């Protein structure tokens, strides 16, 4: 890449998903004159990619943050991931929760741990992430807490979850 402003840029549809329509922009020549939909541009980051699932209780207190390394991704969905306990990721999750005073329930965000820049958040979603089953199996219990909140029961989410748990996804065919 001939770096545009020293680092390449990442271009993707605002309403996109599953890695549809993404492009790496290394020079002005990589840009089209027009796009069929609104596009978002951000700095292209390097390094390992992580998703952090968090649970924020009714008073706005973060009750759990479970990061997982996205070891292998297919069509935007993690197919191999591993939980990773890191104090810096927990601090980022706490700061994010504090920066979103109205946020409640389950959120997820993604970051790259860029070797030059350090961890950089690039996406925040007010929903369960696609890799949430890994966080749940590791001890997050966030879905259970959504239900407990709705019926007024005490929460079970905590910071006590299994580090180093690996999840593998696979496809199977069914013939009728």
What do these predicted regions represent?
Residues 87-176:
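ATP-dependent carboxylate activation and anion-phosphoryl transfer catalytic cores
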Residues 18, 49, 129:
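Conserved protein kinase catalytic core
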Residues 21-102, 108-120:
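Phosphate-binding site of ATP-dependent enzymes
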Residues 15, 46, 126:
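Short, glycine/acidic-enriched loop or turn micro-motifs at the edges of active sites
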Residues 8-28:
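Conserved anion/nucleotide-ligand pocket segment
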Residues 1-5:
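Glycine-/Pro-rich loop/turn segments that contact NAD(P) or position catalytic residues
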């Amino acid at each position: 890449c001939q770096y545009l402003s020293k680092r390449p840029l990442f271009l993707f549809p605002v309403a996109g998903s599953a890695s549809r329509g993404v492009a790496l922009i290394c020079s002005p020549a990589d840009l089209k004159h027009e796009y069929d939909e609104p596009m978002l541009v951000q700095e292209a980051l390097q390094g390992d990619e992580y998703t952090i699932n968090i649970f924020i209780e009714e008073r706005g207190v973060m009750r759990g943050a479970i990061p997982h390394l996205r070891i292998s991704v297919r069509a935007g969905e993690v197919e191999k991931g591993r939980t990773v306990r890191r104090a810096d990721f927990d601090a980022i999750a706490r700061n994010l929760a504090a920066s979103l005073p109205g946020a409640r329930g389950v959120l997820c965000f993604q970051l790259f741990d860029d070797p030059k820049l350090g961890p950089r958040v690039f996406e925040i979603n007010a929903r369960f992430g696609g890799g949430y089953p890994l966080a749940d199996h590791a001890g997050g219990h966030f879905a259970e807490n959504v239900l407990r909140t709705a019926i007024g029961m005490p929460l079970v989410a905590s910071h006590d979850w299994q580090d180093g748990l690996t999840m593998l996804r696979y496809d199977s065919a069914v013939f009728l």
